[in-house]
Amino acid sequence: MKKRVMILGAGPNQLPLIKKARDEGHFVITVDYLPENIGHRFSHHYVNCSTTDKEGVASAAQQLSIDAIVTTASDVAVPTLSYVAWLLGLPGPSLQTAHFMSNKVQFRSFQQKNRLECPKFIHSDTFDDAWEKLQTLSMPLMFKPSDSSGSRGINRVEERDYSLCKKAFWNSHMYTRSGIVCIEEHIDGIEVGGDGFMSNGELVFCSITQKFVRWFVPVGHRLPTNIAMEDQIRLREQIATACKLVDYNNGPVNFDVMVSRGHITIIEMGARSGGNGIASLVKHATGFDVHLATLRNSLAMPIGKVPDCKKTIRGCGSMILGISQNGILETMSSAQELKAEIPQVFDCNFSVSCGDIIEPFIHSGNQIGTVTFSCKDESDYAQITACIEKKLSIRISTIKTNDEPLSNISSHDQDFSCNLKNALSVK
């Protein structure tokens, strides 16, 4: 008998999970406030509702008699997932767990209270109050919306300048629902990402990626990671400890961590799997299917055999695609053409078609697809991504806008002067 699985979100990042649920023979219900989102084309039924509308999603879930509810790549959907799971008695993170893990201010407070490594921070809903509080922080500063995801609204300010800080504050404020901005000291180090899985209170799997970032937006990942084994061990211990302290015992966990000499600092940790092709990358490199484990866990089924996450069966990488300016997509190679041209490519997910309006790649929500491929090392990664960019043959017609850049602020929400090659190069 088919299980009715509700998936929160129907964008490009949710598409692989939607396809996996279909492949497993489930009746798939997608929830999203954008009817044109690509994931709806692959589900059996869709609900036109925001994933942050707890009561709206709960009402639909009850009417449709769902058996499970999941999401991926979306922190903002986790509180809704938790609420519906609690209401219907389904597996999912607790309300308290979702509260701490989906809000940057709450997560920093949780880290501070439990004496976990974290940057010094303040938060406020008005700039004048924030300006007074941030005098206690050391420069440079990171401005972040407290309850957004996908790298939206993140700004870095180098100088304690009133005008620059004000611009950064209100730019981050645009992306909040609560109106609260989190301001924290910048941490130097090597930034890594990855996916893990909790089962019966234990971190049974944890794959750590090398992460490539441009203006705080991920543009790619690679396995194996680029940090030492001793740091990998310490990182896994930190993730396991944080999950236990926040009472997260079963389900996927996505993380971004800064690794520096003597310090492992969790930047973000979500009660869901990651987007940007990480699941495909992890499966190819380790043999562990994060999406399949997520679906099985949501249906109260055993997640199956878990491989040794310290071993990489084969090296591979992912490339997140985006355009540096507004435009109408005129031409782009198909997935089949790209695979034929580049034999290392084994997975392509494109979320746009010719004729679509493309927005600048200033956050993960504006990506146009992901490509996953085999690669030996970082040098090989750079060569293959350059080849992919060339073979994609992307051409757009420009749309003029009157947007003004945020000068002197390091922000992915300023005007992108870089071209596609620079945006996707290895940093």
For each predicted feature, which ranges?
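ATP-binding N-terminal substructure of ATP-dependent carboxylate-amine bond-forming enzymes
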Residues: M1-T97, D128, M301, S351-N366, ...
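Short, conserved charged micro-motifs
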Residues: G56, A130, Y162-K167, N326-M332, ...
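Active-site nucleotide/adenylate-binding loops and adjacent lid/helix of ATP-dependent enzymes
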Residues: N103-V181, N200-E202, L223-T241, C387-K391, ...
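Internal nucleotide-binding/catalytic subdomain
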Residues: I154-I264, S273, A285
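Short, well-ordered beta-strand elements within core beta-sheets of diverse protein domains
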Residues: N155, E185, K283, Q367-C375
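Short beta-strand-to-loop capping motifs
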Residues: V157-E159, G196, L321-Q325, V371-D377
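Active-site "cap" helix and flanking loop/linker of ATP-utilizing ligase/carboxylase catalytic domains
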Residues: R234-F255, S260, G270-E330
